[in-house]
A protein has these predicted regions:
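Zn-dependent metallopeptidase/amidohydrolase metal-coordination segment
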Residues: 172, 179-251
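Substrate-recognition/cap regions that form aromatic- and gly/pro-loop-enriched pockets
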Residues: 112-189
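A short small-residue
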Residues: 36-44, 147-152, 217-225
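Midchain, well-structured core segments that form catalytic/ion-binding scaffolds
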Residues: 1-128
Length: 252
């Protein structure tokens, strides 16, 4: 992610000093334009703490630049404050769900349009509160500098983990994998299973069969440009899914 600034030599020199020991960010100058580039680490929106937000790096550095005007520093400071954590506290929603745990808030997009700056957040909050509850708290917390708007909302989804179908799925997994101690888990992924009455979402790979290549952090994961699938683990998952359909189909 990059930012272009019309700046004086003093600003460039200040930025160079500020970035001297940080290889995540670089600065370049051409004529009267200064370009600041930050490199983050990609992560799934359900697990933002696994990544590094490039905008957060930029905002933290630029918000402290004394050679930027006071208004610009204030804007970057407000951005930095919003991106201070991934658990919702910076947005005024430090909430936790009994089943899913702490809320997550992932900033994925920043843009300027018609002279106004906007940041988009993917907020995932489980089943104990509603979208309206979350939005109201964000509005109250940020109203001094920002206008909060809900673009798209989906309430949490959870089926009974102790239901008969869940027990059958777990029984099959334990039998095929040989792991008698395996337990189901919940995650913040937005599954299509929510659109069906009695659909439990399960994985598409059996990780115990996966021999993952060693990749740098931020590579190879879900939805990333270099996402990979372990064939052996995928074929093992087909066995599990087939056995699950047979098990759940009996006496249905």
């Amino acid at each position: 992610m990059g930012a272009q600034i019309a700046g004086k030599p003093e600003l460039f020199d200040e930025l160079v000093r500020a970035m001297a020991n940080d290889d995540r960010i670089a600065v370049d100058r051409a004529d009267d334009r200064i370009t600041v580039t930050a490199k983050g680490v990609a992560a799934h929106a359900a697990h933002p703490a696994d990544g590094v937000n490039a905008l957060g790096i930029l905002a933290e550095v630029l918000g402290k630049c004394q050679n930027l005007c006071e208004n610009d520093r204030a804007i970057f400071g407000r951005i930095s404050a919003l991106l201070a954590d991934c658990n919702g506290a910076a947005l005024g929603v430090p909430l936790a769900d009994p089943a899913f745990g702490a809320l997550t808030a992932a900033n994925g997009v920043v843009r300027t349009e018609s002279g106004k700056l906007s940041l988009s957040f993917d907020v995932r909050f489980g089943c104990s509160v509603t979208c309206d509850d979350v939005l109201a708290k964000i509005e109250q917390h940020t109203s001094d500098a920002w206008q909060a708007q809900n673009i798209r909302a989906t309430d949490g989804f959870l089926l009974d983990p102790d239901g008969e179908t869940a027990k059958k799925i777990l029984h099959v997994y334990r039998t095929v994998s040989g792991n008698k101690e395996a337990e189901p888990f919940l995650m913040g992924g937005c599954t299509y299973a929510r659109h069906l009455k009695n659909a439990y979402s399960v994985g598409t790979v059996a990780w115990y069969k996966c021999k993952s290549p060693v990749l740098p952090k931020g590579h190879g994961g879900a939805h990333q440009s270099d996402e990979f699938l372990c064939i052996d683990a995928f074929l093992e998952a087909i066995k599990i899914l087939t056995a699950t359909m047979i098990e759940c189909g009996e006496n249905a």
